[in-house]
Amino acid sequence: MYIRKLVIKRMLYKAIGEKKYLKLMYLRLFKKRPNLDNPQKFSEKLFWLKVYNRKFLKPLIQLCYDKFTVRQYLKEKGCEKYLNELYGVYDNANEIDFNKLSNSFILKITQSWGLNMVIKNKNSADFALIKKTLNLWLNLINKGKAQHSPDEGYVFNDDAKIICEKLIYDK
């Protein structure tokens, strides 16, 4: 189903072009037309950036698209103090040694949004299910690149990974 949706989006993108496609996606999401000539809302500005800036800033977008590689960029810019503590980076979930992790942490797929697992207490966690789910997500992301979504406008050069970070709580 996921791959099928991506193929349909890609066909539509090729048929009507990037700018019209993005306007259609905006209309679908926000139920109104975007003002790309004079963007005022944050969402309009993001869509404007998708249309115009990614052609000129592709190397930077590539770097910042991945949750792990963006960390190096932030360090180079002197922003390391804003980064969450990183416990590990893994090519697949089978590499994770849960015994070496703190009691609470968050696992994230580096080239996605919403594919995160919050572990508040590892003593009550089902590690087999966690590994199975993470590997499924990685497979979907890495194989889905062949049928990448035109919403992104490019395919990240490297495979997605899993990162494990300190779990931060609101006060």
Where are these regions (language model features)?
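Active-site nucleotide/adenylate-binding loops and adjacent lid/helix of ATP-dependent enzymes
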Residues: 53-54, 63-170
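Membrane-proximal basic amphipathic "stem/tether" segments
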Residues: 1-58
